[in-house]
Amino acid sequence: PLGQRVQIILLDVRYDRNPLVKVTREERAVRKARNMGYYRANHDPAARMLGEDQWGWLERELRKPADLRLIASGTRVLAEETGHEEWANFPRDRRRLFELIGKTAANGVLFVSGDPHFSEYSKIADASVPYPLWDMTSSALNQYNRGKRPNARRVVGPFGEPNFGVIEIDWNAPKPIVHLSTRNLKGATVL
């Protein structure tokens, strides 16, 4: 209905992505002690997470009318300094994503992501976007990680047992309210 339009965008973040850059053997030992992964940011200007056709499609989608936009990514969008697969490994494309959201005046963007085998919520205030961006990470039902990985943008979590995410929208409020929660296998709210 008008005023309650939800747009769901599913990104393919592997098809056109450049290979991840691994750290040196010496760096691995230091990172392992911090529960970090073995990847680092790729600052090559040609390094990309999405291809040009994908960027064009995404811009057209963000220009469509919507009251809330859920952008799903197989890897975390806002997490930083983890050393694992994430958009921060491609800082140029991550910056481009934030700027595209601002340029298209896409309101109500919420990222939903997976991959690290635990749940957490991350948040960033970026000058390109007139509102804070949130990333709800939830995974997985059969593979999980109890270790606490670093993330400079984490505001809630992590929860490292089997889980799933729930998004509820209260359209009756003067401005829609989005409720995020992480549930365990019994359905109990844990985050």
Predicted regions, residues:
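Long, structured stretches of catalytic cores involved in phosphate-ester chemistry, encompassing
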Residues: 1-191
